[in-house]
């Protein structure tokens, strides 16, 4: 059986900047290539402005690459019409800000039913509702019916991000682009959301691109780490190898700038102990 893949091939993104009569070109992403396999998590690590979110936006068809290709299962994903619609049913995004990514005027169940209807038009209203409730319970918002008719302001930040994860799964996505999914949450609830993502990744055999500046979580939750610096991938490899034996000076700088480098391993031990105790 073939493995499903999401591939970025030689992605380049340039932005033209104007200042008065002068123009300049910002090379935001420079010839970046990688492949995400179903059931695997790849972390894209770098400081703000390194190009991480630009790559995410290109993968989600929110930005058009200056050059390069995005392939789903080895086929070009296209940029228009039904090709993009089919692509987006398979590739979904969890945005950074759970307070802005949900419409405050709509109920929680509406946020889930809409993509289900869009991508599965043959389902009856009852089937759509049942699928939405099932998704709420899959992300540990249980019982689902008790959350369905609430609005975003009635949920905590962590609960909202769980809804965002459920919405990403609603079309039947096989790949998730998670752009700093816990950076705006309280430290006390970050681990729970990341554990949920890890569980869903295993249970659903999802491919995940985990975008972060947090090396501790990148090490634990990823199979592979790519380090991005000014639009270039300067280092990549198995997560432990990159963290424990960094080769590039920028990776060493990121590790040196971590508030408590000794916690890079401790987080892994804590999470493993928690998962083992379930």
Predicted feature descriptions by range:
Residues 20-23, 77-92, 110, 118, ...:
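ABC ATPase NBD coupling module
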Residues 2-4, 18, 25, 142-146, ...:
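Short catalytic/signature loops enriched in Gly
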Residues 151-155, 159:
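Conserved ABC ATPase signature
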Residues 60:
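Helix-to-loop junction immediately C-terminal to a conserved catalytic motif
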Residues 68-79:
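Conserved ABC transporter NBD signature motif
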Residues 218-220:
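A short, surface-exposed alpha-helical micro-motif characterized by mixed small hydrophobic
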